[in-house]
Amino acid sequence: KDRTMNDLSAGSGVVKPTDFDTYHLAGNSPALFIATPILKRYDELKIAGDHWAQRPLEVWNPNMRRLYYIYGGFWKAKMVSPEGVADPLYESTNQSPIATSTSVDLQVDDYMFMRPTQSEFVMLQFGDLLAVSGNQIVDKWPVFHQTG
């Protein structure tokens, strides 16, 4: 049995990406999220190249009646806020489309939040971690950088 414990494995247990949602860490709360701004908002579903499917999808699924494009994407992460919003319709590293119901009323420059499935690799894609308490950024923490 592997009993290896190091600062990386302990750190992952502390920030708790979804891959660490285990019985042993049930008492820990997730502490690592990706915040991404909304770039575009459409009050109808717009699917590139599939305009014929737009209206039937909106009628069939009320969660496909509004469309947001978020910055970036293709991250190893799951959408967590706003609550009940699904992962992107398709993955893109540039802009990712997020379909929602009309009850989700966000605007351009608001943020959506994702919870990473892993920690070390995802952290390499961003700058410093921002420590937040309440609604205030209280500190910045550097992350390890990949070296070659």
Predicted feature descriptions by range:
Residues 1-148:
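Active-site anion/phosphate-binding pocket segments in diverse small-molecule metabolic enzymes
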